[in-house]
Curated annotation (Swiss-Prot):
This is Actin-depolymerizing factor. The keyword Lyase does not apply. It comes from Vitis vinifera. GO terms for molecular function: actin binding. Pfam families: Cofilin_ADF (PF00241). InterPro entries: ADF-H, ADF-H/Gelsolin-like_dom_sf, ADF/Cofilin. Actin-depolymerizing protein. Severs actin filaments (F-actin) and binds to actin monomers. One of its GO terms (cellular component) is actin cytoskeleton. Belongs to the actin-binding proteins ADF family. Residues 11-143 form the ADF-H domain. Keywords: Actin-binding. GO terms for biological process: actin filament depolymerization.
Amino acid sequence: MSFRGLNASSGMGVADHSKNTFLELKRKKVHRYVIFKIDEKKKEVVVEKTGGPAESFDEFAAALPENDCRYAVYDFDFVTSENCQKSKIFFIAWSPDSSRIRAKMLYATSKERFRRELDGVHYEIQATDPTEMDLEVLRERAH
């Protein structure tokens, strides 16, 4: 598939399953995280992996590919200084330096449209290596 076939302003479509899985994370808390990938044959963003509510941040980070781009949402639970339990949803655009330039371009041009489909995301992080999205970064952004 060439880039000429893509509308750069709209990017890829979004599979209904992707939207529904995000809503399950947001409303029902059945997932700790969801990792999405672009299916170039279907020309849409699809769910690649979900993590159960008991899965850790380390398990989430390990599930992201080392050399390829992905989108992810992570439901971050924390306790405020007032001792209140809170939860914030992070959208993470994972684009490691070692990924192919074509993949980086594809994910970059599709990000905004996909992100708009995910109503209820509190924060967005663009990460090129794990240190840009570690737990400390999430804590700082959430407080």
